[in-house]
């Protein structure tokens, strides 16, 4: 007889996945089809649960990732979990809408620098204007063994580069207040330049000094000041101790 079903699940494992390759494949299939492949999947698919050894997506390389994909209103919800990150990425149907990234944690390895070595910009060579618009937040940011608190921002590509709007953070006794902005641009010589403009609050000065490795010999409460800082490189090269 005829097999009938309401919805289906996909489970399994893959050695390598490059998101952009799959996107092109679906576009190619869609070009030969009289029906919307994405609409059919949205209607019939309940979930995709796949373990991926190497995942490449949006310029990021991830290893040993557990993925869980479901359908939401007007978006695909992609759950990702590995050593580096854990959280949800909502990929909207409309290209005009930003990606929405909500992470429980984001962890980067930190290599110890030898004598005379300089820190390498992890975003060197990246064109900020080519990065997709996204709304980002993480409850925990770690670099090596160092905790750098909670962060959130809305990234928007602009003609001169990119802009982190509505930036807010709580890191080692400092609070970057919402509505702060980071501008990331490329100058006429192809060199990256970043700047920060916004409000910073220090609720307990002695505690902040201690968390940043300084003697807590100065006390004070609720210090709030406006900062306007310019530095060479991408936003990743900011020196918070300045």
Placement of each model-derived feature along the sequence:
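Blade/loop signatures of beta-propeller domains
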Residues: 40-43
């Amino acid at each position: 007889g005829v097999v009938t079903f309401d919805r289906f699940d996909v489970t399994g494992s893959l050695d390598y996945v490059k998101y952009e390759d799959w996107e092109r494949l679906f576009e190619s299939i869609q070009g030969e089809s009289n029906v919307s492949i994405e609409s059919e999947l949205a209607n019939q698919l309940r979930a995709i649960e796949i373990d991926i050894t190497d995942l490449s997506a949006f310029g990021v390389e991830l290893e040993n990732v557990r993925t869980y994909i479901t359908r939401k209103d007007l978006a695909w919800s992609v759950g990702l979990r590995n050593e580096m990150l854990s959280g949800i990425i909502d990929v909207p149907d409309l290209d005009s809408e930003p990606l929405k990234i909500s992470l429980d944690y984001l962890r980067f390895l930190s290599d110890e620098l030898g004598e005379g070595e300089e820190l390498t910009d992890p975003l060197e060579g990246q064109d900020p204007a080519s990065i997709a618009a996204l709304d980002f937040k993480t409850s925990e940011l770690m670099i090596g063994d160092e905790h750098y608190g909670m962060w959130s921002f809305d990234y928007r590509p602009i003609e001169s580069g990119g802009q982190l709007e509505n930036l807010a953070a709580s890191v080692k006794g400092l609070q970057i207040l919402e509505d702060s902005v980071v501008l990331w641009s490329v100058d006429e010589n192809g060199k990256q330049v970043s700047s920060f403009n916004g409000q910073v609050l220090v609720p307990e000065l002695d505690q902040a000094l201690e968390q940043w490795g300084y003697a807590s010999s100065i006390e004070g409460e609720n210090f709030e000041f406006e900062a306007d800082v310019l530095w060479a490189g991408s936003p990743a090269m900011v020196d918070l101790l300045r």
